[in-house]
From Swiss-Prot:
Subunit and interaction comment: Homodimer.
GO MF terms, alphabetically ordered: magnesium ion binding; orotate phosphoribosyltransferase activity
Origin organism lineage: Archaea, Methanobacteriati, Methanobacteriota, Thermococci, Thermococcales
Organism: Thermococcus kodakarensis (strain ATCC BAA-918 / JCM 12380 / KOD1) (Pyrococcus kodakaraensis (strain KOD1))
Keywords in alphabetical order: Glycosyltransferase, Magnesium, Pyrimidine biosynthesis, Transferase
Keyword Cytoplasm assigned: no
The protein's name: Orotate phosphoribosyltransferase
Length: 185
């Protein structure tokens, strides 16, 4: 494990971004834990690290892309930081088309044939990020890969991986393995 990835995992605990209790997830599933990536993506140091890790992973895997996109709300700061890190234009995918103005479901420009690196904060089943991919593809974009900060390992990798390259920075099993390790003073 890289030092940077190790640092990101440590940040989840330092920032208390893993909560235990009873939670209903975006997927509709009930869970006894919640991964709150927003606690990290609202902290400049953590957000920079996430962007650096994502850019490095894309480069390591040979993933080329013209634009960075993320679905609202959780992925917007992540996509923004990655766009700044890579100097690629940003696209924000709305959950629903605007009811005013242009009525667009996208903020930012996508041209036919653009390769888009689509990012997400957390995946469970992958439904939210797949809906965003469909919106981008309707505009003519090609999804270069889907990258996520944390995969909960509840089916997203299989579902997304059936059609796209799926790259989680951290799997929930890696977070929980760290939780069980003795903490360094």
């Amino acid at each position: 494990m890289s030092d940077s990835k190790d640092e990101l995992i440590r940040m989840f605990f330092d920032e208390e971004a893993i909560l235990f209790g009873r939670f209903i997830l975006t997927s509709g599933k009930e869970s006894n834990y919640y991964i709150n990536v927003k606690k990290l993506s609202t902290k400049p140091r953590a957000l920079k690290l996430i962007a650096k890790l994502m850019a490095g992973e894309a480069q390591k895997r040979g993933i080329t892309f013209d634009r960075v996109a993320g679905p609202e709300l959780g992925a917007v700061p992540i996509a923004t930081a990655l766009a700044l890190e890579t100097e690629k234009p940003l696209v924000i995918v709305r959950k629903k088309p605007k009811g005013h103005g242009t009525g667009s479901q996208l903020e930012g420009e996508v041209k036919a044939g653009d390769k888009v690196l689509l990012v997400e904060d957390v995946t469970t089943t992958g439904g939210s990020v797949l809906r965003a991919a469909e919106v981008l593809e309707r505009e003519g974009a090609e999804i270069a890969a889907i990258m996520v900060v944390v995969d909960r390992e509840e089916g997203a990798e299989e579902t997304i991986g059936a059609k796209y390259t799926f790259l989680p920075l951290v799997r929930v099993s890696e977070l929980f393995a760290r939780r069980k390790e003795p903490q360094k003073e």
